């Protein structure tokens, strides 16, 4: 609920302008609620129309993507790139290929990305893009033809100093390779225009692990500040993609026992601890569903549907699957089962009422824009390596990532305390990220 009149007017304009964009509304409301204390202290923002400009993308590109399937039939998908804010650097954000992709989802992701990128301390703005194309069930040749068609339009709007996309759901190393190859072919340039690249052509060590590792580094700092740790804790993780897999790996390395993982069909509960090598084989090599886990580990249980993952008793919950996966009923189950920490690995995985419930019950809560910033932080480090024409070791990148995540935690915590909301990392992260962007936007005039 908004109390500041200026914030209310800005939010009402967002609702009126794009009434159907529910995900975007949710993201804007959550951010404006967190920014109210700062807006109260800085009336000059209203005169400059700062919030109105902040919630409106600088540019939205929509385009058709025609491609031919293996049967020779022409297919047409829709492509997008939302270039949200470049006040502190070139647009930076992933590409998502999934049937559910629409403009509302990409605007919410791009909006969150602006603040997340600011929090890293790196000079990168925010954006997001993708398509309603579904790579699942497609041959490598079909995926290649789609990616080449997609890049044939997108290349006009991106560049190493303009907009640097990366991967997201449905866009992994294979897709990034095809996209990069087509960009290089069209521009006749070898530049760091994409991140998440293969190591043989400009990628960074530790990029694959970065979001999951960074999530655990952030959560570890939050836990230590509260006198707790991962050591001996039981952890519930949702998802089985990059974020979930490497969050599982790092949580285990920090002494925890991970007992759940999921995909879009259901989840597995392994009370003896998830066999991560098996999950990697199933998901990264064989591209199979998580249900196959129990055929190798019969002591584990498979359950249809994803929401039940939060009914499993745990100490720490790491939602790493997709937006709005952790709802109020899941939050209530976590609290009832003694969970004391929730750290978001996916983008906006918790609904507002779930977050409010967790916070009201004293649960340590890490918002995605802070806790899952490790991926884009390491993308920024990949951009730096590309610009310098060198490669850092895994340990060098991991150390820089760890330092960035520690700094993000301390920045969010200190900012929350500064504005009288000690412990509220949601508000702290929003304000800490916005302060830098607001300063840059005010300095650059009405643009």
Summary of predicted features, one role per range:
Residues 2-27, 222, 335-447:
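Adenosine-phosphate binding glycine-rich loop
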Residues 22-25, 41-48, 121, 158-167, ...:
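Flexible, glycine/charged-enriched surface loops at secondary-structure junctions
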Residues 44-75:
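Structured beta-strand/loop patches that form or line metal/cofactor-binding pockets in enzymes
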Residues 63-124, 128, 132:
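Phosphate-interaction motifs
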Residues 98, 117-231:
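Glycine/serine-rich phosphate-binding loop and adjoining beta1-alpha1 elements at the start
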Residues 203-311:
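Glycine-rich phosphate/diphosphate-binding loop of Rossmann-like nucleotide-binding domains
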Residues 266-365, 370:
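Rossmann-like adenosine-cofactor binding region
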